[in-house]
Structures are given as structure tokens and as C-alpha cells.
Amino acid sequence: MIKYGLISRVDAECIEATLNYICNDFPDDYYINIIEIGVYNGDSSRGARDFLLNQKRGVCYHAIDNEKDKPILRPFEACNLVIGNSSEVYNRFEDDSQHFVFVDGLHTLPQVIADFFCYSSKVCPGGYMCFHDTGKHLDPLSGWQGVGSKDDPDMCLGGVRKALRTIGLLNNQLPGWKLIFDEADAEDTGGGVCIFKKIKKWD
């Protein structure tokens, strides 16, 4: 079984299903391009790589982290590690270049909104964006992010799902995007993924 570190099996299965969709929908693209925001120990980076290698595909992986929590090591040798704030390095990537963007950085409402609008244009039509720690079961005041007030859910895990609702993603109100997965392990104190497909070019 491929290991994904802190990501639950439910979350991992949704991510793997999405990567499988990508492999099927882009049969002529040997290399699958991925951006991950928030690296930590790199387990999810290695998990996605291992899954794609098992599918006989290559991976061009960019991992972004600002090292606020700790020094970050490159998850694997071929990974391109970018040290910096996600909202400051997004223009290093070409528009319509990525098959999959995994957002697991600063879990506050304003940062999740910023990450969507900074990176949505980087996703190619038919590609996907995945947001972590979106479970409906989560205590919105859990997982304070170290900024703002501990009593403000927008500065805690509650900010992630609220951000997706504010953008219009959760109810399929944002043109050009479609909700594919909204799943979580109810026994997990964190976690959950919302995965959205880009169904037309962002403009």
C-alpha cells in the first residue's frame, strides 16, 4: 500500500482516483505535472509520485513551502522544491501547465482564497485542484494556524471549507469548475478533501 503520511486512507483514495482520471484523460501526456502547496515531511509528494510510477507515468513535481513550521527537505530527488510563500511564487509556473494542484498550505480563509486565485490559472482544462482539511465533521475552531485569533474559525481549519464556499466552488456556482469529490474520514480529527475539475479555460 502506498503511504501518504498524515493523509487518511479516504483522502488518499480520492487523490488516487483523481490521478487515475488524469492518466485516462491525458493518454498522450507521459509526464503528469503537479504542484503541491505545503510539503511538511513530503509523504504526500512521495505517495503521488509512487502512484503515478505504478501507472507507468512520469511526474514533474513542484513542491512549495515557506518553511514556517520547520526546514523542508526535498521529498524525492527529482522533485523541484520551491521555498517561498505560495502567494508570492505562483508566477514561476505557466498558465494551463498543471494537471493537478494540491493545496495544503496555510489553512485560513484568506490564504485558501488567495491560493485558488493564484493557481487556478495554472491548471490546464481537464485538470484538477485539490484542497485538504475540508471535512464537514471538523471542529471549525480546531487547527489554529498561528495567525489572527484562536477564536476566529477563519484562522483555523474552519476557514478552508468556508473559503471554498465563498469562492463558489462547493455548490458548483463558479463557472468553469465542477466539484468531483467532497469526502472525509469522520474518525479523523483533521483531513477531508474537496477536489474540483477545471472544465474550461479560466478567463
Segments and roles (model prediction):
Residues 1-102, 106-203:
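A short alpha-helical cap/connector motif
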